[in-house]
């Protein structure tokens, strides 16, 4: 109650303060801004009095959770002058501000009067605040931003929409992702992530890439074949897809002013500042048509199917399969009727086939997940029992052989799920009579690659086995093996630890053998990769 009364009193005092000098006030309603690293707060109004700058803040956050405004918060004008925060009205600085049921709230922040003639200001909680709120380029003189200067490389090249998709080659080499964060400002996140979906393993980790002071960035990677990547500048609202290919450069420009506009409470319906990202590189036309592609898939996919879980597992599995097949056919028909380029159509037909195959592979798990959602409070034993029942009911011929043919098509490697299929190759090949082809070669390469990733260098026998693989696969494996050997040699030179050999023991006796050397002592044991 005391907190509510204090907040109410502060709001009244603030209103009196503003009303007392209203004739001299200058008010900017819903000012446009350049960029923001948050959707939790936005400036809804700026009031310039003869002595203060008051920001009305609209807050939007998860209901019953809190946000906080640090006492280190300050404004910086267009000449570089700083104005430290003086007080909050309706919010106490450095204290938790709990969001109501609606998830929306308003309060005011008071700063010194900005310099006369200021064109804009930046808002920051300060570099010392981890995850602090930052808003750049809040406009005071205009309801428009300065013109966005587009690099020449960003201008789309003319392409023939009738050209078919260039068949991805299985080759090895360095691929480069480079580009620029447009409108990059001091204080913006100084790194972004590149997430790689390797045709051999699927998700292959993400890499932090530093951003230079002018907003440019560049990263090179060893890659086998054409791979799907995500350039992720998450705090600034940019998440864009690119393709990388050995020997080629993938160039991407990130438009953070547009990314911030579409996330804005007050400006998302306003005039666009262009695309969120621009791309030049492999499969350029597919990326250029990405928005149309996403809209087409969303419209043709249809509603999420529901199931009567009182039916037998065999019936549920057949209903699920029919729904997935029907969905794929609807999407293929939509693709054929679309005005997309032939390259995008070729890419999409491969993508649809891969998504269908992946969906059928995961049928027991997906149905179990829907069953769990329908039941809501389900304990783990019931969940696992249902999942086991679905797996047992899965017939051997559930996935038609014709659907597996896509795995031997090079276009399949462009899909992010291809690497996951390669990881499951042993299971797929045991369950189905797979024809020899691209997939079996990638599966053999993948098995050797996983060993290297598990810190096991290639043996002489494996190197001999490797000779049956395409040259690109051999080059990739040898390069990864050399990296591992170099790492192992470097680790041998480290000190401060001792490696103990377990010796030749049966699997069931391994742990007992390891700890036997330390009998009577306290041990910290770290178990990992137990699956």
Regions found by a protein language model. Give the residues of each.
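Short, solvent-exposed, Trp/other aromatic-anchored flexible loops in extracytoplasmic proteins
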Residues: 84-129
